[in-house]
Amino acid sequence: MSIQKIAQLAGVSVATVSRVLNNSDTVKAKNRERVLQAIKESNYQPNLLARQLRTARSYMILVMVSNIANPFCAEVVKGIEEEAEKNGYRILLCNSGSDIERSRSGLSLLSGKIVDGIITMDAFSKLPELAGLIGSAPWVQCAEYADAGTVSCVGINDVDASQHAISQLANGGRKRIAMINHDLSYKYARLRERGYKSVIHLRDLDYQAVEYARALSSSAGMAAMQNLLKDNPPDAVFAVSDTLAAGALRTIQQAGLRVPEDIAVVGFDGTELAEMISLTTIEQPSRDIGRKAVDLLLNKIDNPDAPTERIMLDWRFISRAST
């Protein structure tokens, strides 16, 4: 059913239907009633349209992710979608790649009132630019967050989680613990590296090596591990994602080394991949992060003056055969 058909059924112009759909107060009461009746009779999403007309809301949420190929991001999005649908909302997904121009294109939906609010998973370094584009619209940030500010956020304590992972390796007798990190424009990368280095310093370990992967992929993890094996190889590796850790495992095995006897490996995120390859990992409550982000956003939509909230959820260390 098109807007033209609704106009024909109501006996009004397409422009009048458009004004009704946009909740304009310039429409005569009798014409508004005709349009609403036509919508009802046409069975064209009657519940959604009726709600939009009553509340001046679209019941759509824009979700901007930095990398939908990242299993962690995909799981967070699943949690967002589940909670959104439970509350009568749908999501529009934008894979921004943390590119500000792509973000700008997606955010144009805010000014057109096509979406009621936005959930982002962009790099911390992009938050100031995003804030300028989003303005006062309801907004929640996932995983990447500022320590202070006006944007509500939900995530985990990355420093504590990484400290625990490195401490577990050190407690197991590992002396040469390396790290495979990623892009430092992401706050999680900086925080996890901070946790790694703090334990290395606290335990007075002589060995410290950080290799930066070009992407959050298995192939990038393989390349990073190859570099770590060149000189004075580690006896343990902590990777900031399960995909990087999976690549590291493959390189170790191809080099004829044993896991965990020669080199132990710990990942991060707690994805299905980690379970499949029996990888020790830090499990993030990814779907709960998504669900909580929706709760925060809907509260902001309903209460624009609601105070900013910073929610830190619990993580879990899962020990498997790689350590």
Show the residue positions of the predicted features:
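N-terminal helix-turn-helix DNA-binding module of bacterial transcription factors
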Residues: 1-57
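Amphipathic helical "hinge" segments at domain boundaries
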Residues: 44-109, 113-116, 197
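Hinge/beta->alpha junction and helix N-cap segments in small-molecule ligand-binding domains
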Residues: 65-75, 93-102, 154-164, 180-224, ...
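Short helix-capping segments at alpha-helix termini
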Residues: 86-87, 200-206, 229-233, 254-259
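Flexible loop/hinge segments that line or gate small-molecule binding clefts
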Residues: 98, 120-164, 185, 243, ...
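Periplasmic-binding protein-like
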Residues: 114-121, 178-180, 211, 232-243, ...
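Flexible loop/turn connectors
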Residues: 231-236, 240-323
